[in-house]
């Protein structure tokens, strides 16, 4: 099993190109099942989760072709893919494939909407709480699907097609909004989604669906209206920049000191996180094609955050921000309101010398003068990258084990950091 070795203490300086967003690319790829025509996606990151979904789509009969990379990207980053679902051979998504990645469960929506049936295994993925699929299934049932659970599979059918309806989500759900958008796009009549997720990735999916011929209004607000159409066609669409990768590298610069330009990204994708980062004493400046992050001298000021749905502070940056706060000059309070059991990185940060106390959904971080390198173990995707950030600022060498988590969500991480001066190396098993 691969490991990453990091010798900390080197400020980061240079330029980091931001990849396409995994959390946008996944639903976009799944949307290829809605049409028999070709969907071409630009700026798709090269990640383990993308490869896993490609295998799942291939199992259904979707043809996949890599045709190039985004201009300015290196050989290990970014790709343009063409997906064609003209010969779907199977509407079953088996356990051995779906269990590798939770988002793959979303194939249930386009399969049901286009073919009237789907049999999809209950999902796997990051071990950060239950992440129930109840809200996704509720949305499909509201649209007229008949659903039963049989042997660990969700079996969904519709006799006469899906029907437009009103869906009021009891809590904000990104997955539920993705599923409802895809299903409603081919439903008869009008569907209204209330308390819909406002995340940029939802907007990106909606914009792609509109290019495919869907009639959608209100994406990016809490009320989305979808007028169903009889069929969707192919299109060409560029995946939006990864706001979580952007925030991750911004926090790494803040923690190590230095001056880095993050290019191919946008400030509006993570305004709340950047505002919080600026409050810690880090200089954050908008560039024409990205963001400049600088912290040269001076301590890290403590800051309190509460994770919230967009446009609030992202839960996917909580672990990284906690790593930054371990070196703040004072106490910080971090409250996690989105997912349960998302503090698994705490005990590993403690191995580096962090002082963190947990109280339910609250983490109280007492800043220390320095961290020291140690062997640590990644437990999930975001936790693993928080350990990378901590290790970059720690004295001595840190060995991070189980780094396959990183490969699920961060494209060419070692190469991007090394180009900015980080002493980082992957040791392959």
From Swiss-Prot:
| Record-linked InterPro entries | Enolpyruvate_Tfrase_dom, Enolpyruvate_Tfrase_sf, MurA_subfamily, RNA3'P_cycl/enolpyr_Trfase_a/b, UDP_GlcNAc_COvinyl_MurA
This enzyme catalyses: phosphoenolpyruvate + UDP-N-acetyl-alpha-D-glucosamine = UDP-N-acetyl-3-O-(1-carboxyvinyl)-alpha-D-glucosamine + phosphate
- Reply yes or no: does the keyword Cytoplasm apply: yes
**Biological processes per GO annotation:** cell division; cell wall organization; peptidoglycan biosynthetic process; regulation of cell shape; UDP-N-acetylgalactosamine biosynthetic process
What EC number(s) does the entry state?
A: 2.5.1.7
Give any GO molecular function from the UniProt entry.
UDP-N-acetylglucosamine 1-carboxyvinyltransferase activity
Q: Which residues bind UDP-N-acetyl-alpha-D-glucosamine?
A: 102, 131-135, 316, 338
2-(S-cysteinyl)pyruvic acid O-phosphothioketal is carried by which residues?
126
What this chain does, per the entry, is described as:
Cell wall formation. Adds enolpyruvyl to UDP-N-acetylglucosamine.
Q: What is this protein called?
A: UDP-N-acetylglucosamine 1-carboxyvinyltransferase
Q: Per the UniProt entry, what species is this protein from, by scientific name?
A: Methylorubrum extorquens (strain CM4 / NCIMB 13688)
This chain is encoded by the gene named murA
């Amino acid at each position: 099993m691969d490991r990453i070795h990091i010798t900390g203490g080197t400020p980061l300086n240079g330029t980091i190109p931001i990849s396409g967003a995994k959390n946008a690319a996944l639903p976009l790829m799944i949307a290829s099942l809605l049409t028999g025509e070709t969907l071409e996606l630009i700026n798709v990151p090269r990640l383990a989760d993308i490869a896993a979904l490609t295998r799942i789509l291939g199992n259904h009969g979707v043809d996949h072709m890599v045709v190039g990379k985004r201009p300015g990207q290196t050989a290990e980053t970014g790709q343009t893919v063409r997906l064609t679902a003209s010969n779907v051979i199977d509407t079953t998504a088996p356990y051995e494939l779906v269990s590798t990645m939770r988002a793959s469960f979303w194939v249930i929506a386009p399969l049901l909407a286009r073919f009237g049936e789907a049999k999809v295994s209950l999902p796997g993925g990051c071990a950060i709480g239950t992440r129930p699929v109840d809200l996704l299934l509720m949305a499909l049932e509201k649209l007229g699907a008949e659903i039963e659970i049989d042997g660990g599979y969700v079996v969904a059918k519709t006799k006469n097609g899906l029907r437009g309806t009103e869906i009021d989500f009891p809590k904000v759900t990104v997955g539920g909004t993705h599923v409802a958008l895809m299903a409603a796009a081919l439903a008869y009549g009008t569907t209204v989604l209330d308390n819909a997720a406002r995340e940029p990735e939802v907007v990106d999916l909606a914009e792609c669906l509109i290019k495919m011929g869907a009639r959608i209004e209100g994406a990016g607000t809490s009320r989305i209206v979808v007028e169903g159409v009889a069929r969707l066609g192919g299109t060409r669409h560029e995946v939006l920049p990864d706001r979580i990768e952007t925030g991750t590298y911004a926090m790494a610069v803040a923690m190590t000191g230095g001056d880095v330009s993050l290019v191919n990204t946008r400030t509006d994708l993570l305004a709340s996180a950047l505002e919080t980062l600026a409050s810690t004493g880090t200089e954050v400046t908008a560039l024409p094609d990205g963001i400049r992050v600088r912290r040269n001298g001076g301590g890290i000021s403590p800051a309190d955050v509460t994770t919230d749905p967009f446009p609030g502070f992202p839960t996917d940056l909580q672990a990284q921000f906690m790593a930054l706060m371990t070196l703040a000059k004072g106490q910080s309070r971090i409250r996690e309101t989105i997912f349960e059991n998302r503090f698994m990185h705490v005990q590993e940060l403690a191995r580096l010398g962090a002082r963190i106390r947990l109280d339910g959904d609250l983490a109280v971080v007492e800043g220390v003068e320095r961290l020291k390198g140690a062997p640590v173990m990644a437990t999930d995707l975001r936790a693993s990258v928080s350990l990378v950030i901590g290790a970059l600022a720690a004295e001595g060498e840190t060995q991070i084990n189980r780094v396959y988590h990183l490969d699920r969500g961060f494209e060419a991480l070692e190469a991007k950091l090394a180009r900015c001066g980080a002493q980082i190396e992957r040791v392959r098993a």
